[in-house]
Amino acid sequence: MIRKLLLSILFLFAVKISAQEDKSRFSLGFNYGFGSEFNNRNYTFTNHFYKIQLYYKLKQTKHFQYQILVQPEINFAEHQLLNFYFVKPETPDYEQKRAQYIQLKDIREYVLNCGFLVRKPIGEICSFYILGSIGPMITDTETERMSKGFAFADVLAVGFSLNYHKIQFDIRPNIRHVSNGGLSSTNSGYNTRNIEFGVSYSL
């Protein structure tokens, strides 16, 4: 439901953007972040990632600013199954899969997230914001929690920004969920907590 609502909002904003062009509304940025799974006895998952971010300022009111953004991302992760009983005996070749999945794995995720951001300026140079984003991704490794291939990444973040002329510095804690949306039988996915640091430039 949340995913459908965000997609509808992004579509409406994209239509509005196509009807008006104003280059001063755009910013281009780069973020680096890292994180790990919430405490979990079944598996470990640690990651670090790089994002390019294209912001578009949709609207400015007296108290708030509204932006949309596109975020191409590459994510480098390490995952290991800790509780091999997570792979049930009814799973085909379950003993072989247990032996396979319990090994430490390197995972690459290639993501294209689209987000909606609500910003609250504090004075002239500072602001706080809330960001929600969703998007498709490709993962290159099968695990006991998710099939290899197509999936989705959902992110909910809060952030703090500091502006200096046309440059903006960001710190952004977030919660991230990835899964394949039921497109494959293996769909437990991952839940991680992360923090990002970024810089962007107003074009």
Predicted segments with their positions:
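Gram-negative (and chloroplast) outer-membrane scaffold detector with strong preference
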Residues: 51-139
